[in-house]
């Protein structure tokens, strides 16, 4: 079992606890993303966004990484919607501004 697989197993175990579920879900999604399992990352991140309490300010990492997972699946319009949602909360978040620019100018 590789390090990412071990991390995934630990994040999945941690999700059983009620505290810290937003960050744990984000890290689990990123781990699947890093493994190239974009559809699974999408499912994890989307489920967390839809089911966990909190606003976009609390879920900004989940929203950004869902955009990344969608973009990696070449679902550019959907990715753009999530990037713009993240941009509305924090214009300086990682490379979200560059990603929005690329997707809106067709420079994928």
Where are these regions (language model features)?
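"A position-specific structural signal for the A-helix of alpha-solenoid helical repeats
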Residues: 27, 64-65, 99
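TPR/TPR-like (Sel1-like) alpha-helical repeat modules
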Residues: 45-50, 76-95, 101
